[in-house]
Structures are given as structure tokens and as C-alpha cells.
Amino acid sequence: MKLLIINPGSTSTKVSLFEDGREVATESVFHDAPVLLQFENVNGQVPLRMQVCREFLSKQGVSPEEIDVFVGRGGGAYPQKSGVCVIDERLVEDTRKTVSGSDHASKLGVLCAWEFGTECGKPMYTLDPTNIDELDPEARITGIDGIYRKSQLHALNHRAIAMAHARKTGKPYRDCRFIVAHIDGGVTVAAHAEGRIIDTTEGAGGDGPFAPTRLGSVPVLGVIEYLEKGHTTEEVRKMCSRAGGFVSHFGTSDAEKVHRMAEEGDEHARLVWNAMIYQIAKSIGEMACVLSGNVDAILLTGGLVRFEDIVEGIRSRCGFIAPIELYPGEAEQEALCHAVLRVLRGEEEAYIYTGEPVWNGFPWEKKS
């Protein structure tokens, strides 16, 4: 059985071919911000991402019709529970509309899988979209009545890495208390406890550390002043997930380039690079407080964990909290494949997207 795994990110498209659970080939294609910002919105990137997938299959000598199941990373629709979800017309429509409010590249996995699946008449699935919602009530509240913090993170990799580390330690995931930091084109930091992601930075929502493509937490008055100078809300929205961070400072989302600039003595690049590390460490500290200081491990994952100075910068500030474990890159392709295989073998059940958010407000708001 052949599975095509489609995993679009803010700076790359990663595609894998699995056969009977075995990885046959994987390719990751980098997309710098100037290329992606040519598109008016994320939906406009579908042809580009589909081209990457088709070229990958061509290199493997496999036609789309030979694929048995198409699996895509998800996001953009209403928040749902964790697990495997069937990709159907309702999910695709809400994903296109970005009803969740976060227009992130992860949604393209569902849209590309849908294009392939409908073209070839094959089943399609997604797993742990970026907005699975398991937050504690306290994590939702803000200082403005009616505005709530959302669960918006690299949920697929967070859960895959947390579960892998739990297996490594011999404990069930539900009994572990982890802080996971996914560090790549976007950065999200979350607290895991009782088998749930109970709090997280809202990665593509202007919250938490800034990143190569994201603005992170910015003082609200500063944003108001920015808008008063003639900038638009659409510009700010783009900076939340596509045009902030390194892109705003340097016009590129290429971390290698910015790191090289910093190493070669560019003061601006050095300060911005170190500030990103500082902010990641600060968010880890916040999540340690969420877990009342009872933390089994801090798990660092994502593509930028390959940079030693990022790891050491976090270790120097957060090493007192808990042991720091490294999982460079991500485990998303394997997680997508094996979860869907468990469904196909009848070991787990896929759920159908409801078209309603899993959390829809507090009881006192539902008065008639």
C-alpha cells in the first residue's frame, strides 16, 4: 500500500512516499519569503505546492494514480480534537475559507490531498491539525471580554515528539509533563500534561516568540501606532504568519542566511538572532509555571534545533527547569503515515469533521 504524505510549512514543502509503512523517499523543498509573498493569500500557493508533489512523484517513477491514500497536514478549519480526520468536502470548504482565522501554510496539506484524492478517486486523511483544541479554561482568558486565546501550534509535531519521548522513558504520554518547543519557520512553545496540550503560544496569531516568518508578541499600542502611520490590517495579518520576524527585519525567511550575517559581524542580525533565542527561553519559562514547576523534560524540536547556539542559548537559561532533550527536525511524516495505517488496519477510528469548533465559548455567554 502506497501513501503520499504532503506536509507544507511556512518555508518549505516536505513530501514523502511510504509503502506498507516503510519510507521509500522524502524530499523537502525550501521556499523563501519573497517567493511565497507573491501570492495574495495562502490558498494561492496550491499550484506551487502541487507542482512540488508532482515533481517528487515523477522522480520516484510513480504516478498519482498508483497512490492508495493521500495524507495531508491540516489547519485553518474550525478547531477539532486530536486524531485522524477524514478529508471531505466540508473540511475542505472551511479550510479554504480559513474559518479559524489563521491563514497558515499547513492548510495546504488538506487542499493538496483533496486535489489528488478527487483526481484519482482515492481516500484522503489528515492528522492533528495546527488548531486541535485541548486548552485549560484559564489559558483561554485575556483582558478583553470576548477575545480568547486560541490553540494554534505545530500540534502534529508537538504530539509526535512528546509521545516518542514518553515511549523512550517508558511512561504513558498521559502521565508525562513536558514543555515542547517547535523551532523552525514558525515557533510554538506548549505545556503538555494529562495527555493534552493544556497551554500554548498562539504561533500564527501574534503571540509568543517571533520567528523567521512570524512577528510574535508585539505590544498592542505599538500595533495601533503602526496602523495609524498608514499601514493596513492586512499587512499586520500577513506578518502574523508570513511576513514577520526575519522577513520584516531582513526580507528573507532563510535562517541560514541570517545566522551567517550574524556570524560575520552584522550587529542587527546578531541582536535579532539572539533576541529570538531569548524569547523562546522566556516562553519555556512561562510554560514551566503553567506546569507548577513539575516538568519531566523540555523537548526542543524543529529544523532550527540544528543551530548549536540556539540550543545552548536555551540550555543556559532553562536548564535549571528540567532536562533538555533534542529532537532536531520533526517526526511529522512518520506520524501522519502510521496514524493513518492504524485507521486502515482497524486499530483506530478516524473521525468526521463536524463543521463546529470543539470549544464554543463559556456557559455564561450562552444565555438566550
Which role fits each region the language model picked out?
Residues 3-44:
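Short glycine-rich, Thr/Ser-proximal phosphate-binding strand/loop in the N-terminal lobe
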Residues 55-68, 168-172, 284-296:
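Phosphate/pyrophosphate-binding loops at sites that engage ATP/ADP/AMP, CoA/4′-phosphopantetheine
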Residues 57-105, 123, 131-142:
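Short beta-strand-loop/turn "lid" adjacent to the catalytic site in phosphate-handling enzymes
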Residues 107-115, 126, 133, 141, ...:
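Glycine-rich phosphate-binding loop plus the immediately following alpha-helix
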Residues 238-293:
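Adenine-nucleotide phosphate-binding core of ATP-dependent small-molecule kinases
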Residues 295-314:
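Glycine-rich phosphate-binding loops at beta-strand->alpha-helix junctions
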Residues 308, 312-338:
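Conserved phosphate-binding/catalytic loops in two-lobed NTP-binding clefts
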Residues 328-368:
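Structural signal for terminal/edge beta-strands and the immediately following C-terminal loop/tail
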